[in-house]
């Protein structure tokens, strides 16, 4: 059975969506958005904060900074001891 490959962007967004990890999104115009990713597709990200949803187009995103470390792959262990 062939394993379906995913791109890094989808792995990252799916991980923060599943973990409900709060994040900050910086747009290319300098606007800073914070919230939790509830859904995403090829063109946009649905961000939720304080009971309100915002649809953010990916072409407007500059940087995404999660508030906690992101575990993107199953079996990934913490670094250090």
UniProtKB/Swiss-Prot annotation:
Q: Where is the Sm domain?
A: 10-70
A GO molecular function term, named singly, is: RNA binding
Q: Which GO terms describe its cellular component?
A: cytosol
What SUPFAM superfamilies does the record tag this protein with? Answer: Sm-like ribonucleoproteins (SSF50182)
Function, as annotated, reads: RNA chaperone that binds small regulatory RNA (sRNAs) and mRNAs to facilitate mRNA translational regulation in response to envelope stress, environmental stress and changes in metabolite concentrations. Also binds with high specificity to tRNAs.
Describe its partners and assembly state. Homohexamer.
Q: What is this protein called in UniProt?
A: RNA-binding protein Hfq
| Annotated organism of origin | Mesorhizobium japonicum (strain LMG 29417 / CECT 9101 / MAFF 303099)
- The encoding gene: hfq
